[in-house]
A protein has these predicted regions:
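Juxtamembrane loop-helix boundary motifs flanking transmembrane segments in multi-pass membrane proteins
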Residues: 179, 216, 293, 297, ...
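Transmembrane alpha-helices of multi-pass inner-membrane enzymes
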Residues: 394-435
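Long extracytoplasmic/lumenal interhelical loops at the membrane interface
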Residues: 305-342, 362-365, 369
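Hydrophobic transmembrane alpha-helical segments in integral membrane proteins
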Residues: 1-17
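Membrane-interface alpha-helices at helix entry/exit sites of multi-pass transporters
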Residues: 36, 211, 326-334, 371, ...
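Membrane-interface helix-loop junction between the first two transmembrane segments
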Residues: 22-39
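Hydrophobic alpha-helical transmembrane segments of multi-pass inner membrane proteins, especially
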Residues: 64-293, 333-391, 418, 422, ...
């Protein structure tokens, strides 16, 4: 009976995630969010049902009561976070809010299956990050004038990465993290946000060519420090974000061509200069030639994806732990093995849906600074997702970056929450401005009939006065 329930739940989950993905793109075709609210309500119900079914399987497979309590804690958080955010911000984008819960759901399910202790640690960070970032929309809307801090953001990013270069810990050939007070964090996850804010501030105020040169030099300084740290995945994300922001700000395709050529040259240099890059490229080109060493990680990832098929083997039915650092770079492979390629494809499509929604928000922004911030963060988000998934399926060499909200890692998680909070802030600001404009138009419309009535009364009074004068004149004639 238990096996029957597990098998049925697997296929129900597939049906539900396909339906959720459909709702995600259906939302994008509805211009008015109020009309899309019922769709968002259904999305939330689908997420919670998937969450319940998968946690039932976890309990049945582990027979551990702590799994039940952990599920209840997650459920309470999801409900509180979702409805609390909507209560705090009337104009919040519910699609991005639902997708955040969607990603967190699948990330926690797979992490609990892989390592329950890491899942609990991840959940604690989730709660803290969610609570802290809920105030970001208010701060940006009411308090912060971010464009004034553009040079401070740039200096902070370069200095922080410089600290990593000097005292950072080396992991898989690259210096990416530093430890402070027993806490380890990946600096580039924070710097990628300050980088976008700095570049958006500079480009939105650029009026001459020398302003473009200055912003390009600052961007190059960020990238060069990352290259010196051998964190080439982050360097690529920064480069692509800046190139797109530069194109949006100037509308000159020449910058895209020159930037792409420079990135091509930098790639050749990186291959020649860094041994860990050559190792990853070799593993990408022919992992089977050294399957026990350099090609082991990618081959195990491909085996997992192939073994899972479209429907997946089911939770606890596969062997995802054989993939090195599966909970970070290759978590999409674990999801594909046990929950199916259909689930993995739907997650990819929801990532794409988030990117599309971010770009839609960017097009709505009237302020050039806010527009560039939305574009920059959207590009960073989709490029990071592409690098993670592309590396796991052998589409591109592995870069060591994580999948936002899903992969294990505190720095990545906090960074993703901040990115989505900033995008939400921009959406809320624009929504508030639209409401203010509509209210002003309504007040003008309501005042117009009164003006017409007053004019009509004046005309009537003039006509009455004229008629009285005519009558008086006739009386005098008599």
């Amino acid at each position: 009976m238990i096996n029957l329930f597990i098998t049925a739940s697997k296929y129900i989950q597939l049906l539900l995630i396909v339906l959720y993905t459909y709702c995600n793109f259906r939302y994008l075709s509805i211009p008015d969010q109020e009309d899309a609210d019922p769709l968002c309500d259904w999305q939330l119900r689908i997420i919670l049902l998937v969450h319940f079914l998968m946690n039932c399987i976890i309990y049945l497979k582990t027979a551990d009561m702590s799994a039940v309590w952990f599920y209840l804690l997650q459920l309470a958080f999801f409900l509180l976070y979702t409805f609390g955010a909507q209560r705090l911000y009337r104009n919040i984008n519910r699609l991005l809010l639902n997708n955040t819960v969607f990603f967190l759901t699948y990330g926690l399910i797979m992490l609990e299956r892989l390592d329950a202790a890491k899942a609990m640690k991840q959940f604690v960070i989730i709660v803290g990050a969610a609570a802290l970032t809920l105030v970001i929309p208010y701060l940006i809307d009411k308090i912060w004038d971010l464009v004034r801090w553009r040079f401070a953001f740039a200096a902070f990013g370069i200095l922080l990465q410089g600290v990593v270069l000097i005292i950072g810990a080396t992991s898989y050939g690259a210096k990416m993290s530093i430890s402070i007070g027993g806490f380890t964090f990946q600096a580039s996850e924070i710097v990628k946000i300050t980088f976008v804010l700095a570049m958006a501030g500079m480009l939105s105020r650029a009026t001459e060519f020398r302003d473009i040169v200055l912003s390009s030099l600052v961007a190059a300084a960020h990238v060069l420090v990352l290259v010196a740290c051998k964190d080439l995945g982050s360097a690529l994300i920064f480069c692509l974000a800046y190139l797109v922001m530069l194109f949006i700000a100037t509308n000159r395709s020449l910058y895209l061509v020159l930037g792409t050529a420079a990135m091509g040259g930098a790639s050749v240099f990186s291959y020649a200069a860094f041994s860990h890059v050559r190792k990853r490229v070799f593993a990408w080109i022919n992992p089977w030639a050294d399957i026990d060493d350099r090609g082991y990680q990618i081959t195990q990832s491909l085996f997992a994806i192939g073994t899972g098929g479209f429907a997946g083997l089911g939770l606890y039915q596969g062997m995802p732990n054989r993939i090195p650092i599966v909970e970070k770079d290759f978590i999409i492979s674990a999801i594909s093995e046990e929950m199916g390629a259909i689930t993995a494809i739907c997650i990819i499509l929801v990532c794409l849906g988030c990117f599309m929604q971010m770009m839609v928000i960017a097009t709505y922004m009237e302020d050039s600074f806010y527009k560039l911030v939305a574009v920059g963060l959207a590009i960073e988000y989709i490029v990071q997702s592409f690098l993670t998934i592309g590396g796991a399926i052998k589409f591109i060499p592995s870069t060591g970056v994580t999948l936002p909200f899903i992969s294990y890692g505190g720095s990545s998680l906090v960074s993703a929450f901040i990115v989505f909070a900033i995008i939400q802030a921009l959406y809320i600001i624009q929504g508030n401005e639209d409401e203010a404009d509509e209210l002003e138009e309504l007040e003008e419309y309501e005042e117009t009939p009164d003006d017409e009535d007053e004019a009509l009364e004046e005309d009537n009074a003039e006509n009455d006065a004229y008629a009285s004068e005519q009558v008086s004149a006739e009386d005098l004639d008599l």
